[in-house]
Amino acid sequence: MSLIHPTAIVDPKAQLDSSVEVGPYTVIGPDVVIGAGSKIGPHVVVEGHTTIGADNKIFQFASIGAAPQDKKYAGEPTLLTIGDRNTIREFVTINLGTSQDVGITRLGNDNWIMAYVHIAHDCQLGSNIILANNATLAGHVHLEDWVFLGGFTSVHQFCRIGAHAMTAFTAAVSQDIPPFVTAAGNRAVPAGINSEGLKRRGFSSEQIMAIKRGYKTIYRSGLPLEEAKLALQAEEEKSPDAAQYLRQLREFIEASPRGIIR
């Protein structure tokens, strides 16, 4: 029995694994590749040069691989790549990349993308990310693994959000959020570390306390940022069990192109 509903329109050039399910009235374009076990719900549009991995679930009315919402885009053959085991809920929009950046929008594996989320051109998302309803990523945003964005969070173009960071409902992010940090407000400001998330992911109490000390060094010590980075480096030597996480925090800050939230 065919797993493609008879009302679906699948271009003959599209490459779908034989186990892919396609729901009623879904449209799939000629340059689309979809891996084994993926389920595409009803009324979904998948277009552009889009590659979707295995065991993804895409719900009704999602728009995947449409042209970037960028006036400079002139039809270049840019890409969208989605990994494995992602859940993409109703009315999500994910756009292709642009030639002004690397030309590709990427999602990793095991991400949970809730309804009405927008992921703009050239965004780079890692794995195990949760984007709550109506979260909006402008172009060129980078999210590292295990990021959680609260509902209606908006992220300015080119911002980067570090691993295990979290935002509160309606946060408006205009600068980079370091790893492990919780941000809240419009505009978003630091509001502690994501302690509960770290506990759930197996961080020890000693590691969490060391990360908290690192947070206080950056945000509560009163040190200028350059001096705070040196203090973080010294803290790495005092906390061998958490040194890799403190180093991750420091290196993120050093590499931040927009500067971190303050």
Curated annotation (Swiss-Prot):
KW Methyltransferase (keyword) present: no
PANTHER family, per the entry: ACYL-[ACYL-CARRIER-PROTEIN]--UDP-N-ACETYLGLUCOSAMINE O-ACYLTRANSFERASE (PTHR43480), ACYL-[ACYL-CARRIER-PROTEIN]--UDP-N-ACETYLGLUCOSAMINE O-ACYLTRANSFERASE, MITOCHONDRIAL-RELATED (PTHR43480:SF1)
EC number: 2.3.1.129
Catalytic reaction(s) noted: a (3R)-hydroxyacyl-[ACP] + UDP-N-acetyl-alpha-D-glucosamine = a UDP-3-O-[(3R)-3-hydroxyacyl]-N-acetyl-alpha-D-glucosamine + holo-[ACP]
Keywords: Acyltransferase, Cytoplasm, Lipid A biosynthesis, Lipid biosynthesis, Lipid metabolism, Repeat, Transferase
Gene behind the chain: lpxA
Chief localization: cytoplasm
Protein localization: Cytoplasm
Lineage summary: Bacteria, Pseudomonadati, Pseudomonadota, Betaproteobacteria, Burkholderiales
Protein name: Acyl-[acyl-carrier-protein]--UDP-N-acetylglucosamine O-acyltransferase
GO cellular component, one term: cytoplasm
Pfam families recorded: Acetyltransf_11, Hexapep
Entry's Gene Ontology BP terms: lipid A biosynthetic process
Similarity comment: Belongs to the transferase hexapeptide repeat family. LpxA subfamily.
InterPro entries in alphabetical order: Acetyltransf_C (IPR029098), Acetyltransf_C_sf (IPR037157), Hexapep (IPR001451), Lipid_A_LpxA (IPR010137), Trimer_LpxA-like_sf (IPR011004)
Example GO molecular function: acyl-[acyl-carrier-protein]-UDP-N-acetylglucosamine O-acyltransferase activity
Biological role stated in the UniProt entry: Involved in the biosynthesis of lipid A, a phosphorylated glycolipid that anchors the lipopolysaccharide to the outer membrane of the cell.
Subunit structure: Homotrimer.
Protein's UniProt keywords contain Lipid metabolism: yes
Pathway: Glycolipid biosynthesis; lipid IV(A) biosynthesis; lipid IV(A) from (3R)-3-hydroxytetradecanoyl-[acyl-carrier-protein] and UDP-N-acetyl-alpha-D-glucosamine: step 1/6
Signal sequence bounds: none
